[in-house]
C-alpha cells in the first residue's frame, strides 16, 4: 500500500501540472493494489490547490473539495491516521532543516501502516538513513 505525497495528489488532480501524465501513468499501474491519504496530505492538498501559482488557475474551495472527495471515494483508497509524532525514529537523525519535517513525518506514517510514501521528491529518498530508502518510491 502506498501513501501518496501531496505532490502526487496535486499532479493527479490538475491537468496543467508538469507531472500530470507521469502521475496518471503511475496511478493507473499501481492504484489497484491500493493507495492512501492522511490528514497531513489531505489538508496540504486543499491548501496548495487553492494557490493559483501551484495549480495554474484560481480554483474555489468547492472544486478542490470535490477533487479531494474523488480521491477518498476511490474504491482502492484507504485513510491512514497520522497518529502521534514518533520523535524516537531514526529517520529524524537525517533532518537538517524545516522543509524536511513534514516529509519525514509522512515517511514515518507510511512505515507505521506497513507501506511506503510515493512522491516526486527524489531528495527525500536520499536523505533517509541507510536501510530505509525502500520506504519511499520516487515517480520519475
List PLM regions with ranges.
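Short, well-structured N-terminal submotif of metal-dependent ribonuclease cores
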Residues: 1-37, 49, 53-63, 129
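Alpha-helix/helix-capping structural signal
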Residues: 7-8, 40, 122-123
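Acidic, PIN/NYN-like endoribonuclease modules and their adjacent C-terminal/linker elements
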Residues: 1, 84-96, 104-140
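Short beta-strand scaffold positions
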Residues: 37-39, 101, 119
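Conserved beta-strand segments of alpha/beta enzyme cores
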Residues: 34, 76-78, 134-137
